[in-house]
Amino acid sequence: MKDMKNIGRIVLPIIILLLTVRINAVPVKAFDMIVRNLPNSEQLPTKELLCIFQDSEGYMWYGTEGGGLCRDDGYMVKVFRSDFKNPGILENNSVTCITEDGEGKIWFGTKRGAYILSKTDYEIRALADETIKSWTITTMTATSDGTIWISTNRHLFRYNESGERTGKYILKWKGRENTVNSIYEDKKQTVWVTQAKGGLFCYDKVKDSFISYPWP
């Protein structure tokens, strides 16, 4: 019951804020919005982007549909993908999500497994976990304790910064197993996850398990 009261203190203000924003929303036409193309968009292998990430050094990383992983330093775009010149770099060139761990390594998911890129030599290695090598990675997040969370195929996995798996979780919402579509760490270093078809969960570090919370 104490946990339920605590979550109420967190979730209720958020709901009220969302309702307030919705009620007081100003029509989009009231804003002066300017949309510009990416400065180096002509250097991208494809115009279809699946995700965008800015690393700790300020560089932009783009995950593309079929074009691999792209790093933009503001002047040039470097592309990492498998092609006839560099076969075997990636099993699949569609990059679905990107994050950065505490050591500065870039982690990224594809439609066939996850990879780790070292920014010192740009070497890419596949995550050595046979379980997820053929699965589409839906989302990933690096948290402050050095954990990398990866969601795929209705499973949530936990890894350390060396790429070793340290946990596997199946989250059920109303009796159904669903894929996690977002992972968030709050200011208190608490990890929250949501599922595609409903479901809000909080990670309990002591019990190494997820607690389900009420959701409409």
In which residue ranges do the predicted regions lie?
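Carboxylate-rich, polar loop motifs that coordinate divalent cations or form catalytic acidic clusters
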Residues: M1-P216
